[in-house]
Amino acid sequence: MLIRYGFDIAVTCQVPTPMVSMLSAHGERAHHIREAEQWVTTPPVATRTYVDLYGNHCRRFVAPQGDIALWGDGTIEDGGASDPVLHGAREVPVPDLPDGCLIYLLGSRYCETDRLSQIAWDLFGHIPPGWGRVQAICDFVHGHIRFGYLDARATRTAAEAYEERMGVCRDYAHLAVAFCRCLNIPARYVNGYLGDIGVPIVDPMD
């Protein structure tokens, strides 16, 4: 199926402000693009692009003082299939992991493996390695955190989400990723567009 994606964002800056946007399709999906992405700013400003460490297509520019609008539009082809379920997936011992995976075992600003390591091993260390253990992590996080937009906080970390038992989408992801890393399972998550395909319209989207 063809999916039209895009954005229309307005920002107000008190002073000229350097910015980096990551709103383009990931490079791995380049061969699925069917209508090239358009990227427009109002007022027009000079931009340049680069690819970061993770393969994201980033765009740098300086937003002027006052209002600026960012607008983009593109079409991508996607099969619409759900993520595969691989019950036989196994964990790879740390010595055998590819070099490029090791970075996804490290703690980070939002995933404090040092604070959560003992908790992770207490909760999941008895579960046999493999798909089942990762699924147990996801199931635990799903039941442990209460979702609520009013509970959103940009500074909340995985450990705080665990302690407060509340959060939004990113908090679920941060806690699950942190638990996986604590158990030596390389993990990362991808942030994407909020899709409205086949979703009942209840409230205005984010």
Model-derived regions: residue spans:
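Short, glycine/acidic-rich beta->alpha junctions
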Residues: 1, 168-172
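Intrinsically disordered, low-complexity N-terminal segments that are enriched in acidic
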Residues: 1-90
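Generic detector of short, locally flexible boundary/turn motifs and exposed helical patches
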Residues: 3-5, 33-41, 103, 152-154, ...
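Secondary-structure boundary elements
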Residues: 13, 70, 76-80, 86, ...
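Short, surface-exposed, charge-dense and proline/glycine-enriched linear segments
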Residues: 50-55, 82-85, 117, 163-168, ...
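Glycine-centered loop/turn motifs
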Residues: 66, 73, 127, 200-202
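Hydrophobic/aromatic-rich core segments of domains that either
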Residues: 139, 171-206
